[in-house]
Amino acid sequence: MSDISKVFDLIKEHDVKYVDLRFTDPRGKLHHTAQHVSTIDEDVFEDGIMFDGSSIAGWKAINESDMILQLDPTTAVMDPFSAQPTLNILCDVYEPSTGQPYARCPRGIAKAAEKYMASAGIADTAYFGPEAEFFVFDDVKFKVEMNKVSYEFDSEEGPYTSDKDYEDGNLGHRPGVKGGYFPVAPVDSGSDLRAEMLSVLAEMGVPVEKHHHEVAASQHELGIKFDTLVRTGDNMQYYKYVVHNVAHAYGKTATFMPKPVFGDNGSGMHMHQSIWKEGQPLFAGNQYADLSELALYYIGGIIKHAKALNAFTNPTTNSYKRLVPGYEAPVLLAYSARNRSASCRIPYVASPKGKRVEVRFPDPSANPYLAFAALLMAGLDGIQNKIHPGEAMDKNLYDLPAEELAKVPTVCGSREALDSLKADSAFLQKGDVFTKDMIESYIDLRTEELLAFETMPHPIEYKMYYSV
């Protein structure tokens, strides 16, 4: 049975009323348009659905706005939140004038990275396994006006609520600052919420593993299994969608901001990755930590291009409030076996099939398709140019003396990341995976955000400087 036939079987089986077409913008935000089921026939899968691309930031100008959503029938899944029976289908964005994939479509770029890897003869499969963390609050308020800039959040788990009056009483069980890793209830108040999120993800076909409380108060993580690059990008988009909507249904609010809370750990998205060829893992060998030489070159490519990668893996100004010393954030560009203070870690596994590299500096504000594709391209460049990462750093990098620390390269800041991407993008442009036009438009988009941040007076500036 064809994938398109399966879509129509799902429509019939669930008495579907709407087909929700979903696509991802350059920032990583999921968008949708709902088609009444009567408009969906086999021709739609051939011709696609037209939409206005000028309304999406970083895409078309208004005088060339027409674009096509090309449905991917393999992604069809029932939506768990819609009141009317709704079938979700993820889409790629195409150029109507050429009938080819749009060069700025993130999902298309991820597909192009997989295709380039195979055409280069290095590997035929790239696996990615992200570990995305998030915060859940009971309430959040923020305001940005000429005369007022503020934010305020509240969570019953927060250490700042220890003396707060609650209608049913303040029961006192809550994690302290940096004290939230793996406690049982009642200190962990989010277990049922996370279990619901994980169950909904499983219903949507996302392969799930576990859930647990994270280090910070009100911080959580769901574990999903690794998959191929594009498929994992799809799974991450549904991960965020489910987390936001289940939290909303519980009367709470979830955020994937890397650093919403000052003074506690931020949220990362560690990315486990490996490449295979003809069913064989390419990262297992007899070098350091039982890695292959090819795996070391892959790590070398990531470390060499890390500052350009930061523009995709840590794309927001808030990202760099997480990447500071003192909060378990991997700011040092080094690699090590099992050592979580290094930005590239090689987890211990007994099986060669499980041999992988964990890149620890990315965060969940990243567009998953672009971040995964950029990491793969950096790793492939390392392999092609035999870029060795140097000696491993097996000591605790957080405790290095100042003179040793100064010799270890670090991740960068928001502006430096964009400048680095501008100067170091040739590895991304191989095979036209990331086109020059796409990179320039992405830099422009993120520069707008950076300028908005840099030119806005901050409340702490009033505290420090008002009386100068």
UniProtKB/Swiss-Prot annotation:
- Keyword Transit peptide tagged: no
Catalysed reaction per UniProt? L-glutamate + NH4(+) + ATP = L-glutamine + ADP + phosphate + H(+)
Q: What does the record give as EC number?
A: 6.3.1.2
Q: Which UniProt keywords apply?
A: ATP-binding, Cytoplasm, Ligase, Magnesium, Metal-binding, Nitrogen fixation, Nucleotide-binding, Phosphoprotein
Gene Ontology terms for molecular function: ATP binding; glutamine synthetase activity; metal ion binding
Description of activity control: The activity of this enzyme could be controlled by adenylation under conditions of abundant glutamine.
Residues bearing O-AMP-tyrosine are 398
> Where along this sequence does the record place binding of Mg(2+) 1?
131, 270, 358
Cofactor binding, per record: Binds 2 Mg(2+) ions per subunit.
Necessary cofactors: Mg(2+)
Q: Which residues bind Mg(2+) 2?
A: 133, 214, 221
Boundaries of each GS catalytic domain copy? 106-468
Where found, per UniProt?
Cytoplasm
Cross-referenced SMART domains, in alphabetical order?
Answer: Gln-synt_C
One biological-process term from Gene Ontology?
Answer: nitrogen utilization
Which sites bind L-glutamate?
265-266, 322, 328, 340, 360
Which residues are recorded as binding ATP?
209, 272-274, 340, 345, 353
Kindly indicate whether the keyword ATP-binding belongs to this entry: yes
Q: How does it assemble?
A: Oligomer of 12 subunits arranged in the form of two hexameric ring.
Biological role stated in the UniProt entry: Catalyzes the ATP-dependent biosynthesis of glutamine from glutamate and ammonia.
Q: What family is reported? A: Belongs to the glutamine synthetase family.
Q: What is this protein called?
A: Glutamine synthetase
Q: Which organism is it from?
A: Azospirillum brasilense
